[in-house]
């Protein structure tokens, strides 16, 4: 079973990807990890990618797709895989289809922007320990201070509301064509079309996990 998981920053995609990978015993495939591994192993594709990166250029879709096809040949992908952060663009999705890389399921974790902004902008971190709090959902005993050390908590730059809004705007601009592409393809009910599901991304981590696994295992 090959799965693409879509979700905005803060939608819980990383957490759910871990659960899905473990429950279905399939690897979670990240293009970043693949790229680093191929460069380190000095595979032909890895050497080509290194040459591009050393020149300060972006790795092309052709190289990324070659990495994906190379990775899918590994034994641990025999029962499928979960794509993490791929495809990112409509061009990559179309290239997958053109090259005959089948996808069984596309799952979108749907969370309103307002909810994501609340989730992310409310995070506070104790930098030296990594302990994380939330001003609404998991507040420290004393406002602004770490429970164990009493040291100040900080808001990471990535969690500032303006930054979150910009990240969401980029996500929607980039992902809307992907959602339209896969949902449209799925609705055609033709052979080899993936199943597309939009899953409510609010509730407990376990509830969301069960919703996703429910649609993946009911077919």
Swiss-Prot record:
Binding residue positions for AMP: 31, 36, 57-59, 85-88, 92, 156, 167
Keyword Transcription tagged: no
Enzyme Commission number, as recorded: 2.7.4.3
Keyword DNA damage listed: no
InterPro entries in UniProt: Adenyl_kin_sub, Adenylat/UMP-CMP_kin, Adenylat_kinase_CS, Adenylate_kinase_lid-dom, P-loop_NTPase
One Pfam match: ADK_lid
Residue ranges of the region described as LID: 122-159
CDD domains assigned: ADK
Region (NMP): 30-59
Keyword annotations of the record: ATP-binding, Cytoplasm, Kinase, Nucleotide biosynthesis, Nucleotide-binding, Transferase
Catalytic activity: AMP + ATP = 2 ADP
A single Gene Ontology CC term: cytoplasm
Binding site for ATP: 10-15, 123, 132-133, 203
Domain notes: Consists of three domains, a large central CORE domain and two small peripheral domains, NMPbind and LID, which undergo movements during catalysis. The LID domain closes over the site of phosphoryl transfer upon ATP binding. Assembling and dissambling the active center during each catalytic cycle provides an effective means to prevent ATP hydrolysis.
Self-association state and partner proteins as the record states: Monomer.
Function recorded in the entry: Catalyzes the reversible transfer of the terminal phosphate group between ATP and AMP. Plays an important role in cellular energy homeostasis and in adenine nucleotide metabolism.
Protein name stated in the entry: Adenylate kinase
Provenance organism: Chlorobium limicola (strain DSM 245 / NBRC 103803 / 6330)
